[in-house]
């Protein structure tokens, strides 16, 4: 699963969403469930051996019964419901980074968001803003102010480039209200309202 770019594609644990083993997910995560699959396969192999049959069946029974019981447990209790709106511009990849398309692309997302302002959170795709963050400040300020006025938060992906260090980052930034009690628009360039992706992936956003 690590052959493509080092990212865990199609890990074994994802295959157990409907099985009793998924009950272990809140405790050991997807990687732990992958390990349990290997253990389970070993146990099933040992079942065919007369000397290890009884022990293998007992351990397998305990493993899957434990998973089933854990799956019945409610691990989190929702405290509040939040409404989320998502905008997908479906911009063709061939036009994504064409400078002449910057304006039309950003206009598309602005228009798509007009019907979403009443949500608690609005989500734009990873490269919704096709300009480097330092060059997109007027547009980001506009979205930031509007989101604040509408009492909501908007998160979007954008590429940031540091001219001093010659480093580029694919960032997730927050515009508008990061917290409900914020007294002013949250976004500032190079503020801590961002998360920089640590691993780039060869995937597109066109649906």
In which residue ranges do the predicted regions lie?
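Membrane-embedded alpha-helical bundles of multi-pass enzymes
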Residues: 1-73, 114
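Soluble catalytic domains of enzymes that build or remodel membrane lipids, polysaccharides, and related
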Residues: 72-207
